[in-house]
Design a protein with these regions (language model features):
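Short glycine-centered helix-capping/turn motifs at secondary-structure transition points
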Residues: 148, 244-245
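Short acidic/histidine-centered micro-motifs embedded in hydrophobic/aromatic stretches
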Residues: 191, 236-240, 270
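Oxidoreductase cofactor-interface core, primarily capturing Rossmann-like NAD(P)-dependent enzymes
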Residues: 2-27, 31-32, 47-49, 57-60, ...
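Amphipathic terminal alpha-helices
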Residues: 252, 257-270
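Terminal hydrophobic/aromatic helix or amphipathic segment near a protein terminus
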Residues: 186, 200-244
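Structural motif detector for alpha-helix initiation sites
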Residues: 164, 196, 214, 263-264
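Short loop/helix-cap segments at secondary-structure boundaries that form the rim of catalytic
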Residues: 31-39, 54
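Rossmann-fold cofactor-recognition segment
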Residues: 36-48
């Protein structure tokens, strides 16, 4: 049996769609009563150990989508709880959606590396999908204003962005053949790096890219009503891209998909 956690999230929902025709898959979510799903659903709450121990019973392969929305200690506690429960329940293999290695400069990298280490120290089989940042995230971070300006502190930096749907496709392919990917770490970044100027050109001649400073971005984000932990996360993301740490491309995604990855610009503008 396959179980997918976080099935109501943006990535999890795409994965659930792709597994809908299988009779060996169940979906996990914190609020199953609010989830209309094409597959059986179990209550899986990373903050509630009992739901994990019960929900993971009978599971052979666990696709563990990162519960990364929170402070580092919160995320590590959630992931550690899930790994311990999976091991206790007799899960044979865990596929974990992590963060690209080039993201080590990002403020939210530490819980991912901690989780990878915990998985590797467990008695279960494991596969780590080091996902690149979504093209859709870049589009949100650098969205045009009503007057046609993209204002973001990206400088000349570029991001090897990935279409979220490609990461969903890759996760499904690995999960349904987990044994063939045991002990593997995949760097799932894009094959083309894009920046603010590329986004502006893709929007058309009426849109211009105007870099701002990190301080300006911090003030703007702080005034937007973002959660306190979100502001340094987003500013750190801008900083890493601008500094050129997120532009390295790779071919693991194409290898898993068996096709060319989708254009990050097309995904960003969709």
């Amino acid at each position: 049996m396959i179980l997918v956690t976080g099935a109501t999230g943006a990535l999890g929902a795409l994965i659930a769609e792709r597994l809908a025709d299988r009779d060996d898959t169940v979906l996990g979510t914190r609020e199953p009563q609010r989830f209309e799903a094409p597959l059986p659903v179990r209550r899986i709450d990373f903050d509630d150990l009992d739901t994990l121990i019960t929900g993971f019973q009978g599971v052979d392969v666990l696709l563990m989508i990162s519960a990364g929305y929170g402070e580092d200690d919160t995320v590590m506690a959630r992931h550690g709880r899930a790994i311990d429960a999976a091991q206790e329940a007799g899960v044979g293999h865990v596929v974990y959606t992590s963060l690209t290695a080039d993201g080590d400069h990002l403020p939210y990298a530490l819980p991912h590396r901690w989780t990878e280490r915990r998985l590797q120290q467990s008695t279960m089989g494991w596969t780590i999908l080091r996902n690149g940042l979504y093209a859709e995230l870049l589009a949100w971070l650098a969205a045009p204003s009503e007057d046609g300006r993209i204002t973001a502190p990206l400088g000349e930096g570029r991001l090897a962005a990935v279409a979220r749907v490609d990461l969903a496709d890759a996760a499904v392919r690995v999960t349904v053949e987990a044994a063939a990917h045991a002990g593997r770490i995949y760097e799932l970044v894009g094959e083309r790096a894009i920046g603010g100027a590329d986004l502006a050109r893709a929007h058309g001649p009426h849109v211009a890219y105007e870099p701002e400073t990190l301080a300006q971005a911090r003030s703007r984000l702080s005034a937007s009503g973002a959660e306190p932990f979100q502001v340094p996360m987003l500013v750190g993301t801008f900083s890493a891209i601008a500094a050129g740490f997120m532009c390295r491309t790779g071919g693991d995604l194409r290898q898993i998909l068996g096709r060319e990855p989708r254009s990050p610009l097309v995904a960003a503008l969709a």
